Amino acid sequence: MLVLFVATWSDLGLCKKRPKPGGWNTGGSRYPGQSSPGGNRYPPQSGGWGQPHGGGWGQPHGGGWGQPHGGGWGQPHGGGWGQGGGTHNQWNKPSKPKTNMKHMAGAAAAGAVVGGLGGYMLGSAMSRPLIHFGNDYEDRYYRENMYRYPNQVYYRPVDQYSNQNNFVHDCVNITIKQHTVTTTTKGENFTETDVKIMERVVEQMCITQYEKESQAYYQRGSSMVLFSSPPVILLISFL
């Protein structure tokens, strides 16, 4: 009885120590150059090198390089680069263009930007200037027809011009052009006298607009310098 017990115990120990088939360096997947009943297993059957489940190189589940779940490069769940689920965290979106706050402030203080005129603004209504043209006929003509001439001018921000003359020249041209086109479409025409008088009137209004815009521009610049000085910044930080 004792001998039978010892023999049975020995058989159980040998069964536990016996290696399982299919492990490293077994007949199921040997290193290249080692013969095996299954033939050369390099690369292993049913997948490429390092393919546990039939995927490509380094593909645990059939995805691409470094793809745990079938997404693209660096895609944990099938989204784009840097996309956790393809719906957010898209850091590579182009950033929105920044708005020039200086020009916005200038436009708000001066007038509305006119659509379709390439950034020109329309100034506030003015009283038509009192002008003497050097002869009684033109003086009288102006007094009788001044309502036909513009009382607002078109202009660009003053910081886009190197001097007053350039500002005024551009202001006069665009204002007369727009006023002439608008008035002509209503069936009203201008004579040579009208054009001559209108040029003088609009020029004076553009000079007034330039002086107004220049003053506002330098005031805004002074305010920005004041608030950007270190003592003011320090004071604001304690408020």
Swiss-Prot record:
GO terms for biological process: protein homooligomerization. Residues 47-87 have a biased composition (Gly residues). Residues 223-239 form a propeptide. It is a lipid-anchor; GPI-anchor. Residues 16-31 are annotated as: Interaction with ADGRG6. Cu(2+) 1 binds at residues 53-55. Its primary physiological function is unclear. May play a role in neuronal development and synaptic plasticity. May be required for neuronal myelin sheath maintenance. May promote myelin homeostasis through acting as an agonist for ADGRG6 receptor. May play a role in iron uptake and iron homeostasis. Soluble oligomers are toxic to cultured neuroblastoma cells and induce apoptosis (in vitro). Association with GPC1 (via its heparan sulfate chains) targets PRNP to lipid rafts. Also provides Cu(2+) or Zn(2+) for the ascorbate-mediated GPC1 deaminase degradation of its heparan sulfate side chains. This is Major prion protein.
